[in-house]
Amino acid sequence: MKTYNIVIASDHSGYELKSEIINYLEQKSLKIYDCGTNNTQTVDYPDYAKKVVDIIIEKSAPIGILISDTGIGMSIAANRSSEIRAALCNNILTAENAKAHNDANILILGAKTIDQKIVFDIIDKFLTTQFEGGRHSTRLSKIK
């Protein structure tokens, strides 16, 4: 089974941002698996959320990124699995807390709602923040 650093997908409204993110992450020498979509033709976001979720569950990648117009539908779809902790983040603080307190394994971004000037900062914070454990582990065990 091939492994990657990050698995990524988007629906049609997140395609352009996804392409920019892939370029950014590849410049950091990260191995990225792109699950699509590969253009701006209308698709159903749950199909792409499931692809990322399945890859994380089978341990082919530890982290996922999902992008849609607001990220809300992607969040709902991804969080259907008890092994997934997907967090819709729109600033650096939410990205940091998603990892530090909630051990999030999928970052969700809203292409139409996020400040494009800080999107890479949000991604960097999500990728570099470590889970704090402790009381946060106790809390997470209550929702598994």
UniProtKB/Swiss-Prot annotation:
Keywords in alphabetical order: Isomerase
| Residue numbers binding substrate | 12, 135
Which Gene3D superfamilies does the UniProt entry name for this protein? Sugar-phosphate isomerase, RpiB/LacA/LacB
Write down the top EC class of this protein. isomerase
Q: Does the keyword Isomerase apply?
A: yes
Q: What is its EC number?
A: 5.3.1.-
Looking at the Swiss-Prot or TrEMBL record, what is one Pfam family this protein matches? LacAB_rpiB
Q: Does the keyword Lipid metabolism apply?
A: no
**Organism taxonomic ancestry:** Bacteria, Pseudomonadati, Pseudomonadota, Alphaproteobacteria, Rickettsiales
**GO annotation (BP), single:** carbohydrate metabolic process
Query: Which InterPro entries would you find in this protein's record?
Result: RpiB (IPR004785), RpiB_LacA_LacB (IPR003500), RpiB_LacA_LacB_sf (IPR036569)
Q: What is this protein called?
A: Putative sugar phosphate isomerase RC0402
What organism does this protein naturally occur in? Rickettsia conorii (strain ATCC VR-613 / Malish 7)
The active site annotation covers 101 (proton donor)
